[in-house]
Design a protein with these regions (language model features):
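Short secondary-structure junctions
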Residues: 1-10, 97-104, 137-145
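Metal-dependent phosphoesterases centered on the DNase I-like endonuclease/exonuclease/phosphatase
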Residues: 42-133, 186-192
Length: 192
């Protein structure tokens, strides 16, 4: 069972983070909804909250309304215009050192999590992201059958060996977009 130790709610309702213990091992779970007009500030706030989580196995999941790979993740396929939101999302995932856990286990599978009746299209908009330092703990991933929603749930299985290992620290590149932070960091580097 999951023993909760803490919760953080986004004031705008975009994400909720819960942390606690599973079989005595620290875990962080973040549930995300990013609206279709993906704003850099929303990703920045989410990134800061992720970096503030206590050490533990971390899973960030939800509807990001963006595509990692338009060729594999959209029925529209290759050749359609790559949207700025897709590019921003991929850059954000990379800047935090996150991996698409489902894609790691299904590198060539074409499977969708969202159906748009209005557009007559299918997309994979729902992701389970994990730090690259935790991805070795996964034992599998799959898309589950759709229920009443227009989105299908995604499931990963996590083992427990090595789960207490602390992840490597990494500077979130989103901080460098803040002029005051970049100036302060530059002064510290020159002083060092």
């Amino acid at each position: 069972p999951f023993i909760p130790l803490g919760t953080k709610l986004d004031p705008h309702g975009r994400f909720v983070a819960k942390w606690g213990l599973v079989e005595g091992i620290a875990h962080n779970f973040v549930s995300v909804y990013i609206p279709p007009q993906l704003h850099a500030s929303t990703l920045g706030d989410l990134g800061k909250s992720i970096l503030d989580l206590p050490p533990g196995v971390t899973v960030i999941g939800g509807d990001f309304n963006a595509l990692m790979d338009r060729g594999k993740d959209s029925s529209s396929g290759v050749g359609t215009q790559v949207l700025a939101t897709d590019t921003r999302f991929k850059e954000w995932v990379g800047s935090l050192g996150l991996c698409d856990a489902w894609r790691i286990w299904n590198p060539n599978l074409i499977q969708y999590t969202h159906t748009s009746a209005a557009h007559g299209s299918h997309s994979r908009l729902d992701y389970l992201l994990m730090p690259s330092t935790d991805i070795h703990l996964t034992c599998g991933a799959r898309v589950l059958p759709r229920g009443l929603s227009d989105h299908s749930p995604v499931q990963i299985s996590i083992g427990k060996e090595g789960a207490q290992r602390r992840p490597m620290w990494r500077l979130n590149a989103w901080f460098l977009q803040d002029p005051q932070f970049a100036k302060h960091m530059g002064e510290d580097i020159r002083q060092y």
